[in-house]
Amino acid sequence: MAKVEQVLSLEPQHELKFRGPFTDVVTTNLKLGNPTDRNVCFKVKTTAPRRYCVRPNSGVIDAGASLNVSVMLQPFDYDPNEKSKHKFMVQSMFAPPDTSDMEAVWKEAKPEDLMDSKLRCVFELPAENAKPHDVEINKIMPTSASKTEAPVAAKPLTSPLDDAEVKKVMEECRRLQGEVQRLREESRQLKEEDGLRARKALPSNSPMAALAASGKEEGLSARLLALVVLFFIVGVIIGKIAL
């Protein structure tokens, strides 16, 4: 005996598409329409009942009316290489006069009175998921380009500025050399003068004479040491510029 053709209209007719990401519940709608002049009972079945929640999953559609069924896919780890084998079936039949006990209605239904339509599930990722990859490429390209252009932009700044700095440092170095030489000569003269004064003013074995002489020597030594340190720093700067 030939199977009765489905009287309900389905939108979509063949596929239920679920668009990710699938880290949360994804819902798609199935619209059932009843173009006939009789009420129609329906129920929705799936090959993977643990993966989906269907509301409403059964009921009665009045003549000329339609109904939206929400199919909710539960979160899962999506693998793009794995094809979905999940399927749905919409089963229907013309409603009997008494529909108060739908469970009994379906149990008592004859196979030749049942109509069904099958839909397969399709998982899709949104196009936006590919955009971060393009953004990363755009970030990498300008960075590498700037690195290659940087040495070209830096070339005009090197020679004139370095020559002027070297001249200034060399002049300062010569001035410091003269200052060091002058302080050495001054230190030598002061030592001689202090020695003569100390011998005239105090006995040679006096502690005061030795203290006065050592104090002046320490002052000159400190100034001389400071100049030597400064001279060393200038030398280091010249060495770096030369490199």
From Swiss-Prot:
One of its GO terms (molecular function) is microtubule binding. One of its GO terms (biological process) is endoplasmic reticulum membrane organization. Endoplasmic reticulum (ER)-anchored protein that mediates the formation of contact sites between the ER and endosomes via interaction with FFAT motif-containing proteins such as STARD3 or WDR44. Interacts with STARD3 in a FFAT motif phosphorylation dependent manner. Via interaction with WDR44 participates in neosynthesized protein export. Participates in the endoplasmic reticulum unfolded protein response (UPR) by inducing ERN1/IRE1 activity. Involved in cellular calcium homeostasis regulation. Its main location: endoplasmic reticulum. Keywords: Acetylation, Coiled coil, Endoplasmic reticulum, Isopeptide bond, Membrane, Phosphoprotein, Transmembrane, Transmembrane helix, Ubl conjugation, Unfolded protein response. It comes from the Eukaryota. It comes from Rattus norvegicus. PROSITE patterns: MSP. There is a cross-link at K147 (Glycyl lysine isopeptide (Lys-Gly) (interchain with G-Cter in SUMO1)). Belongs to the VAMP-associated protein (VAP) (TC 9.B.17) family. Residues 161-196 form a coiled coil. It is a single-pass type IV membrane protein. Residues 7-124 form the MSP domain. This is Vesicle-associated membrane protein-associated protein B. The modification Phosphoserine is found at S146, S159, S206.
